[in-house]
């Protein structure tokens, strides 16, 4: 009865070709659109290693004055990353739910990430619930700061959420804030990616069933092993929030990710989100998920 919730995204296991970049982000968007794994955010910023236009060093042999009037006169394009996007499908047979999610994110100045996520949760025979998420993430400490290999990336983030249909007594709008640390360990026989953080939330079942009037602190974590240059596998955990009269189940998943190339990633997972018919907590049962992610 191994109910490892293989959540949606194979979390940050970028292949070895990505490990050399200081601010390199995992090319994945979680269910709420944030750069991260299925349930959890990562400290890395979305697609921070890419830019629309790279800064070009001045050529001392050229004496022509710089051209004016261009969109990049102020170096804007050299500070904006290209976007990344992800699409999710989650099937939870025990609770008869089909969960679809689309998300996109980009970063500025290798310091700030902005994201948007759209979710549609369709219970069999019931009304489809739609949810919108607007996120931002600030990189407080870059990974390996000062050439110290033991320093993880640390980020502070927030997600503004809106749900179309919520139960009586809950709010339609909520806000989550989190602090997360992420570290890629390359000194082991196989590279290991570890991530963990604290979440302050008023979301019931991530906001699908509305937002409580009070906040609770929970924690989350991820561990991924890079098995091959283009293959990773890992485990994800998210603690459920316990509100008065409402206890969310803990979420878990076991996942595998195939980095098809440096732009395209395919993820598959088995997910366990508590007992679907439990009496002590609100769970969604187990199921499977597949997702496809693309980084420009």
Where are these predicted regions, by residue range?
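Bacterial N-terminal signal peptides that target proteins for export
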Residues: 1-8
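C-terminal segment of classical bacterial N-terminal signal peptides
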Residues: 14-22
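Transmembrane beta-barrel domains of Gram-negative outer membranes and organellar outer membranes
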Residues: 24-188, 199-204, 227-231, 243, ...
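Outer membrane beta-barrel transmembrane domains
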Residues: 208-213, 217-296
């Amino acid at each position: 009865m191994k109910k490892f919730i293989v959540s949606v995204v194979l979390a940050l296991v970028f292949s070895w070709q990505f490990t050399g970049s200081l601010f390199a982000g995992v090319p994945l968007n979680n269910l709420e659109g944030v750069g991260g794994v299925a349930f959890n955010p990562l400290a890395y910023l979305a697609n921070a290693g890419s830019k629309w236009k790279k800064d070009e060093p001045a050529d001392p042999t050229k004496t022509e004055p710089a051209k004016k009037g261009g969109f990049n006169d102020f170096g804007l394009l050299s500070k904006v990353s290209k976007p990344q996007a992800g699409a999710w499908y989650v099937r939870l047979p025990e609770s008869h739910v089909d969960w679809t999610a689309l998300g996109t994110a980009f970063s500025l100045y290798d310091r700030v990430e902005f994201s948007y996520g759209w979710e549609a949760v369709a219970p069999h025979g019931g009304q489809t619930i739609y949810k919108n998420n607007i996120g931002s993430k600030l990189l407080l400490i870059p990974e390996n700061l000062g050439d110290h290999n033991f320093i993880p990336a640390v980020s502070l983030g927030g997600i503004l959420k809106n749900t179309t249909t919520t139960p009586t007594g809950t709010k339609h709008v909520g806000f989550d804030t989190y602090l997360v640390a992420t570290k890629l360990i390359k000194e082991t026989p196989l590279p290991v990616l570890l991530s963990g953080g604290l979440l302050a939330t008023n979301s019931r079942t991530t906001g699908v069933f509305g937002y409580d009037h009070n906040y609770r602190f929970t924690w989350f974590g991820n561990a991924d092993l890079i098995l091959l240059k283009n293959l990773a596998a890992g485990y994800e955990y998210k603690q459920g929030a316990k509100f008065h009269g409402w206890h969310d189940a803990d979420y878990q998943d076991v996942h595998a990710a195939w980095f098809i190339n440096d732009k395209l990633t395919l993820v598959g997972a088995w997910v366990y989100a508590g007992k679907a018919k439990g009496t002590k907590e609100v769970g969604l049962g187990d199921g499977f998920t597949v997702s496809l992610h693309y980084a420009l």
